[in-house]
Each structure stands twice: as C-alpha cells, then as structure tokens.
C-alpha cells in the first residue's frame, strides 16, 4: 500500500517527505496564479515553484476551487508529471474531465455514500472515507472496486477525527482480517501505516 502524506503545501514540507511516498496538496487561485493553500483568503506558495522540488511517487491534487483543472493540467504537462489524480471535485467538473478522456480523478465512497458513484462514474480512483468511524463497509465495497479495476485510496481516520488511534487499529484490523487490497492511504501520520 502506497502512503500518501496529507497536506504537503510547502517546499519545506515536501523536502521532509521521503520520495517513496505520495503527497496530497490543496490548490486554489490567487490572481492569475495557482497556489497551494487549504483555507480560502490566505497566501500560499506558487504551484509552479513548488513543482521545481517535486520528485516523489504520486501527486494527489485536492482542488479547492472549481475550474482550475485545465490550468493545473497544463502545469503538470509542463513539468512532465503523469502520476497524479484529482480529488474533491464536484461531480460535474469530474465528469467534464472524464468526458475529455482524463480518468485520473477520484470519486468518493464512504459509510454514507454509495459505491455506485465511483463504479459508474468512469473515475480511475476511489477515495474511501468514513464519517462515523464505521469502516466495515470496506469489506463489501473494496472487492467490487478491485474487480472493476478502480484504484483505492483510504482516508486515514485522523483526517476526520482527532482521537483516532483506536479507530486506526480497528481499520487496519478490518483490512488484514478480510485481506482487502487497498492501493494507497492518505495520512498525516505515515509512520502509523509502515
């Protein structure tokens, strides 16, 4: 399972991240530039400047504003980056990319959201989340996604809930118990997944 480090929105954080890991970043616009920033109305580093330090395995692009995708794709092409996927897009923007032939997007399934969306959307990734802490749904969902050749990326529990250590152990137990094939996990705590 590939470990994706969550919210690596600065060159300093990128430098601290082993090159064997993937990274997730947040993208917004400022004037006519794409910046890395999770929260609105803040100043972040320029995406193109950040990419001059990129030499990692997988790039997960969390789009915080609709309509950035075309510009982001131009920048990725300029830097020769092809191992990526888009995350947290609205369904219409996700479908627009898919209709243009780019399936490097993630549709979400969770304990509250049906797996049918990722299965029928044309997305090549599924972002697997839990809003209640109930991860048992993975036992039926993951095999269906695997059979459909849709890559899977878990949202590690600490991204949703601060007190997550016992939940993390339960989640890891479910994965092991059921022999689930998960392709990646996005986490603030890579050491918990090694």
Where are these regions (language model features)?
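Phosphate-group recognition and catalysis centered on beta-loop-alpha active-site segments
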Residues: 1-194
